[in-house]
A protein has these predicted regions:
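Bacterial Sec-exported substrate-binding components of ABC uptake systems
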Residues: 4-8, 24-97, 209-242, 365-396
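C-terminal motif of bacterial Sec signal peptides marking the signal peptidase cleavage site
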Residues: 19-23
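Structural recognition of the beta-strand scaffold that forms the well-ordered cores
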Residues: 84-88, 108-111, 155-159, 176-180, ...
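A short, structured surface patch at a secondary-structure boundary
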Residues: 88-89, 93-147, 155
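Extracytoplasmic ligand-binding site segments that recognize negatively charged/polar headgroups
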Residues: 115-119, 162-167, 179-199, 232-259
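Proline-aspartate-enriched helix->loop->beta-strand connector
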Residues: 135-140, 144-158, 284-300
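Structured C-terminal subdomain patch of bacterial secreted/periplasmic proteins
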Residues: 188-208, 212-216, 303-396
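Alpha-helical, coiled-coil/dimerization segments enriched in small aliphatic residues
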Residues: 252-279
Length: 396
């Protein structure tokens, strides 16, 4: 009996040991399965991470571009860093320079007609590098897309109103950003317009708020001028007109909706051609009939006529001598500044001050316009105007 007990006991021990070994093997197998499962999951995770990295790279690639909406309402995708710029037929050279604080970097080409204007203003001295850029086109109707492509620009700036031109430019595959002039983006107020140009340049270069202080400084000048004009009685505010061009003895005046019309509105002058839409051809007799009290002459690039030409009656085909504006020597030429002053430009607040001061001299008798201009140029364009340059601005 004892022998059976010993045998049973031995068998029980063996069974227990076998069960233990089996458990160990099962644990080992389970561990191996878990490790394999974890390894598989790790591999799956790693494999799933791969496309995530690609997506990240895509985002980085997207970060290398910037999508903006221009004044034509088009969404434009631009490279993050812009190093080569072509400016087509839109007069933003001076605003571009002001945006860059007295310099004009990255411009590799622009319209030759714009260069002709720049050559007649102080802009050529502030940013002489502009004179080295290529001429991509010359006349308003010229367009040589092949020459533009050769310059390898990152972006082309163009007149947002000119849809036909955009169609040609955009086919180059080069991003095109439209800047509003007349007929786009609401009313053509020159002061508001140059501010809109500056803001769009902030979008283009990804520098939101860069020109905020500059624009605020301009607003301060504008407010001062507005307050002075407000002191002038309505009955003492004159009638006037802006002679925009004079082509082959045919006068073209600034009618309703033009930059010139908005300038006259700002200074409280009644435009004698306010019922004429846009820049309109009129005959000399119509001007005689309207007989404005003040005659403003447009400036470089548009009208090659000076105050002395008019006062001394030297203009072929136009006898100014019987006009009240001439008799009273109320004729003013906008030669001043870094651009044609009656179109949008960063001198806008100064233009406003000048127009108001010549129109209402009594209200501005203590206003130091020349000092204001000098300070403005030094602060915002990093340029010290000489007395000779100031005198030349007013030699009109």
């Amino acid at each position: 009996m004892k022998a059976y007990k010993k045998i049973f006991y031995a068998l029980s021990i063996n069974a227990f040991l076998l069960a233990g070994l089996s458990g160990c093997n099962n644990d080992k197998e389970a561990t191996q399965i878990e490790e394999k499962s974890e390894n598989k999951e790790e591999k799956v995770k790693e494999e799933s991470k791969e496309p995530t990295r690609k997506e990240s790279e895509d985002v980085i690639e997207d970060d290398e571009t910037r999508t903006i909406t221009d004044h034509a309402g088009n969404e434009v995708t631009l490279p993050k860093e812009i190093k080569r710029v072509v400016i087509d037929q839109v007069p933003i050279l001076s605003t571009y320079m002001a945006y860059h604080g007295g310099e004009a970097p990255y411009i590799v080409g622009y319209a030759g007609s714009l260069k002709q204007v720049a050559e007649k203003t102080v802009l050529k001295d502030i940013a002489p590098e502009l004179m080295d850029a290529e001429e991509t086109v010359h006349g308003q109707s010229d367009l040589n897309i092949e020459e533009i492509i050769k310059l390898k620009p990152d972006v082309i700036f163009y007149n947002a109103t000119n849809k036909d031109r955009y169609e040609v430019l955009s086919k180059s595959g080069i991003p095109c950003v439209g800047f509003a002039t007349i007929g786009t983006l609401g009313k053509a107020d020159p002061i508001e317009r140059y501010g809109q140009w500056l803001t769009l340049l902030e979008d283009v270069f990804g520098e939101k708020g860069k020109t905020a202080d500059f624009q605020k400084a301009g607003e301060k000048i504008v407010k001062d001028v507005e307050e002075r004009i407000a002191t002038v009685d309505l009955k003492d505010r004159p009638t006037g007109m802006i002679l925009w061009k004079y082509n082959e003895t045919v006068p073209i005046v600034a009618g309703k909706g033009t930059f010139g019309d908005f300038w006259l509105k700002r200074i409280g002058v009644t435009n004698v051609f306010e019922d004429t839409k846009g820049y309109a051809q009129v005959n000399v007799e119509e001007i005689y009939k309207q007989n404005p009290e003040i005659l403003y002459l447009d400036g470089p690039g548009l009208l090659n006529m000076t105050t002395s030409d008019v006062l001394e009656n030297k203009v072929e085909g136009f006898d100014f001598s019987n006009m009240d504006a001439v008799k009273n020597e109320k004729v003013y030429n906008s030669k001043l500044g870094m651009w044609n002053w009656l179109t949008p430009n960063p001198d806008g607040p100064l233009v406003y001050a000048w127009l108001a001061s010549v129109t209402y001299p009594e209200a501005f008798k203590d206003y130091d316009l020349k000092g204001e201009i000098k300070d403005y140029y030094k602060t915002w364009y990093k340029y010290d105007l000489t007395d000779e340059e100031i005198d030349d601005m007013f030699d009109i």
